[in-house]
Curated annotation (Swiss-Prot):
It comes from the Eukaryota. Its EC number is 2.7.7.86. It catalyses: GTP + ATP = 2',3'-cGAMP + 2 diphosphate; GTP + ATP = pppGp(2'-5')A + diphosphate; pppGp(2'-5')A = 2',3'-cGAMP + diphosphate. Mn(2+) binds at L288, D294. This is Cyclic GMP-AMP synthase-like receptor. It is an enzyme of class 2 (transferase). Belongs to the mab-21 family. GO terms for biological process: innate immune response. GO terms for molecular function: 2',3'-cyclic GMP-AMP synthase activity; ATP binding; double-stranded DNA binding; GTP binding; metal ion binding; RNA binding. Keywords: ATP-binding, GTP-binding, Immunity, Innate immunity, Magnesium, Manganese, Metal-binding, Nucleotide-binding, Nucleotidyltransferase, RNA-binding, Transferase.
Length: 520
């Protein structure tokens, strides 16, 4: 057995992956608490902006909840939320989208055909430059001023203000305004928890962007007014945003999400600040698009595979933006920054391949490692738990079932979901058989009508007998098929109930990773 085969054998078990996952996965109760307050804050803020500013009220269309939290790739507490406020400007459906800088586009209006509002309105008439391009700096400046003015800090010379819910005169929480890039960040605090909300104005489009590798889907895409400091006409360039497409890609390949979260956890523990979350996700987009991700492998082996892909990207100094290969996301990183992370990463990969039990010392902080040891010591004093058998590779995990229930539940949910889909497909096939039999009977009936009438005694009544025989056969077949359909529908109901029972004990991401919708 060569070295590669030995390493693969060592990486079959997901025991260490499961241990680390305890410190990565968001808990359902905690997530619900943050999400509840965030939803109320969102409703309140949008309501205030619409009430205070006529331009926003007229051109605001809806809200897009974005970011790693809604992609289910978030690590740690849900303390950051992205809130994209979609604006629908006059004549936006007839604009020309032109190529801008790599990763960016320009929005060109035909000044001969645009509505008079662009020249007559005291706000909008400032947003187009002399060439008819929408100026992202001007729109962003309006947005920032509008937010500051509308939210109206409770005290002078303060960026803090109170947020009220619709149904109460008591403050829901307090928020503070901070500026960061194209976003306006609100630091929300209700006394028991704190999180950040990035407010970003975005424009929505349904026409195809000027990108060669773009495959049109049903969902729209967006442009964001990201500020640029240098280069030609920076205010004409708008950053692409394909959030719906990226979310769908991850949804179709659910097994990648925990691996993305583990790499983000490694980054946080190792303090690799140069490795943005979006860079990690982009690496996965490239691998998924090439079908290089074998989801039948253990998560540990897939994790090591993706760490090696990350190392390759660092060595080449190249990580292309998935939607525009001319844009290198690593372009602004220095060689010293890249080399330092790459050397450390290569050492970690080598150590894990040699001994997977070393994973915890790289992925977990000292405090988390200590907590894990306490958990393991406590388990030693308790009655022996059932050992979780990893059905994907036939090996028993050395990690007790009590700590692998999340993974096991996901497997059960996926299996029951697959059973449900199989039953649905069987029902579909049976119904198609019924339709086929009906069509066959109809064709036979038509053929009888088209035959010349034979008046000889020998053949008289033969066609009627054949039709009755076929009709009887059809009736019996339909009865049997209906019985089968009923049996399968009962089986689906039972499967739904089993999934519901499993989910009632699951964490937020245990459910969401499977892609199985919550059942009422």
């Amino acid at each position: 057995m060569n070295g590669d085969e030995q390493n693969k054998k060592k990486l079959r078990s997901d025991a260490m992956f499961g241990k680390i996952n305890q410190f990565v996965t968001l808990q359902k109760d905690e997530t619900a608490k943050y999400n509840s307050l965030f939803t109320k804050v969102t409703e309140s803020i949008v309501s205030i902006l619409k009430e205070k500013d006529e331009v926003f009220k007229k051109y605001y269309r809806n809200t897009m909840y974005a970011g790693s939290f809604y992609k289910q790739t978030r690590v740690g507490q849900p303390k950051e939320f992205d809130l994209n406020l979609i604006l629908c400007l006059p004549d936006i459906d007839s604009v020309k989208i032109e190529k801008g800088r790599p990763g960016f586009a320009k929005i060109k209006f035909d000044e001969r055909k645009i509505s008079s509002v662009w020249t007559e309105h005291k706000v909008l008439n400032k947003w187009l430059d002399s060439e008819g391009y929408l100026d992202n700096g001007k729109l962003r400046g309006w947005f920032e001023g509008m937010v500051k003015k509308s939210l109206n800090p409770s005290e002078k010379n303060s960026n803090k203000f109170r947020i009220y819910s619709k149904d109460s005169s008591s403050p829901l929480c307090e928020a503070e305004i901070k500026k960061s890039g194209p976003a306006f960040t609100l630091i929300v605090n209700d006394g028991s928890m704190e999180f950040a909300v990035d407010l970003v104005p975005v424009l929505e489009f349904s026409q195809s962007p000027p990108l060669s590798n773009f495959e049109k889907l049903k969902e729209p895409w967006h442009l964001v007014p990201k500020p640029l400091k240098n280069g030609d006409v920076p205010n004409q360039n708008w950053r692409y945003c394909f959030y719906h497409y990226e979310k769908e890609m991850l949804k179709k390949n659910g097994k990648v999400k925990p691996i993305i979260r583990h790499i983000k956890k490694l980054r946080d523990t190792q303090n690799w600040s140069i490795l943005a979350s979006y860079y990690i996700e982009t690496l996965f987009f490239h691998v998924l698009s090439k079908n290089d991700f074998d989801q039948n492998e253990s998560q540990t082996r897939l994790l090591v595979y993706m760490l090696k892909e990350l190392s390759k990207a660092f060595k080449s100094g190249l990580l292309n933006y998935f939607w525009d290969k001319t844009f290198n996301l690593f372009g602004e990183l220095t060689e010293d920054q890249i080399v330092g992370v790459q050397n450390r990463l290569d050492k970690i990969i080598k150590e894990i391949e040699a001994d997977p039990t070393t994973m915890t010392q790289y992925f977990l902080t000292k405090e988390e490692q200590k907590k894990l040891k306490e958990i393991e010591e406590k388990e030693k004093t308790q009655p022996k738990k059932e050992v979780n058998v990893d059905k994907t590779n036939g090996l028993s995990s050395t990690f007790p079932l009590i700590r692998e229930t999340k993974s096991e539940k996901n497997k059960k949910i996926i299996q029951e979901s697959e059973n449900r889909e199989t039953s649905k497909n069987e029902i579909k096939a049976l119904k198609e058989m019924v339709l086929s039999l009906k069509a066959e009977f109809k064709d036979f009936k038509n053929s009888i009508k088209q035959k010349p009438i034979d008046q000889t005694p020998e053949t008289e009544g033969t066609d009627e007998k054949e039709m009755k025989k076929l009709l009887l056969l059809l009736i019996n077949e339909v009865k049997q098929l209906k019985l089968n359909v009923g049996r399968l529908e009962t089986k689906i109901d039972q499967t739904n109930e089993q999934i519901k029972n499993i989910k009632s004990q699951s964490t937020f991401f245990d459910v969401m990773e499977t892609g199985v919708p919550l059942l009422n």
